[in-house]
């Protein structure tokens, strides 16, 4: 009710960066569908939308087990979608498992060709030094839980986390493209359960929103 009230008051849509549920269940999916259908909400999928329980291998095969239910949450592609709001192209890309797929970079390039400023909506924040340092301190395993972490760090992770969060070629390609594309003006992300703002590539603000925070962000 509070979120809906803010949306009515401001006239702005809600940008949700994932984990709208904690685990997959019939009841949780029903609640999420009602919320999204009743709210002006643009949604980037998170890892918990696919989570049947903790500790399982996270890959496209695992996603596929619950993807049919996740796809019912929104009337667009959960892997990649865009929406123009106030002259800004908001692009939601699924990186819920710490990687990007090859076609997502190609699709982002086509969005950029529209010529509008782009704000990326991701679940997992992109690697940035200060955020990585904070995450390493908070993690009992000294793990970043970020997308695009250099191999110099992930190679020292416990084996399960290294395989989970290693930066593959497709992910490196996407991040290289984001770093060099000046029409990409900001990144909105979630996943970490706390608020954090930093700068990527010396020019792109990355705004991480925690699990209990509702922000109003002004883009100029």
Residue ranges and their predicted role:
Residues 26-119, 142-146, 180, 197-218:
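Extended active-site neighborhood of metal-dependent phosphoesterases/phosphodiesterases
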Residues 21-22, 89, 126, 194:
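Short active-site segment of divalent metal-dependent hydrolases/proteases
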Residues 18-23, 70, 95-98, 162-167:
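Short, flexible loop segments at the rims of nucleotide/cofactor-binding pockets, characterized by
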Residues 1-29:
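N-terminal active-site segment of His-dependent metallophosphoesterases
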Residues 14, 21, 43, 184-190, ...:
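Short, hydrophobic beta-strand segments that form beta-sheet elements in well-ordered domains
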Residues 18-19, 46-47, 123, 190-191:
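Active-site glycine-centered loops adjacent to acidic/histidine catalytic or metal-binding residues
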Residues 2-13, 98-197:
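His/acidic metal-ligating clusters that form di-metal
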């Amino acid at each position: 009710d509070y979120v809906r009230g803010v949306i009515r008051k401001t006239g702005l849509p809600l940008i949700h960066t994932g984990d709208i549920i904690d685990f997959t269940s019939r009841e949780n999916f029903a609640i999420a569908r009602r919320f999204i259908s009743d709210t002006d909400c643009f949604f980037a999928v998170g890892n918990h939308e696919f989570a049947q329980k903790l500790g399982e291998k996270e890959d496209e095969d695992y996603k596929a087990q619950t993807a049919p239910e996740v796809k019912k949450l929104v009337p667009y592609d959960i892997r990649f979608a865009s929406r123009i709001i106030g002259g800004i192209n908001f692009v939601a890309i699924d990186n819920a498992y710490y990687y990007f797929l090859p076609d997502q970079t190609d699709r982002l390039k086509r969005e950029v060709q529209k010529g509008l400023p782009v704000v990326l909506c991701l679940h997992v924040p992109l690697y940035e030094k200060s955020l990585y340092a904070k995450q390493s301190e908070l993690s009992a395993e000294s793990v970043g839980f970020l997308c695009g972490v250099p191999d110099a760090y992930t190679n020292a992770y416990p084996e399960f986390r290294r395989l989970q969060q290693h930066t593959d070629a497709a992910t490196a390609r996407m991040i290289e493209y984001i770093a060099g594309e000046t029409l990409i003006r900001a990144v909105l992300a979630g996943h970490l359960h706390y608020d954090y703002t930093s700068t990527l590539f010396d020019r792109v603000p990355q705004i991480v929103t925690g699990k209990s925070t509702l922000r109003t962000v002004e883009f100029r």
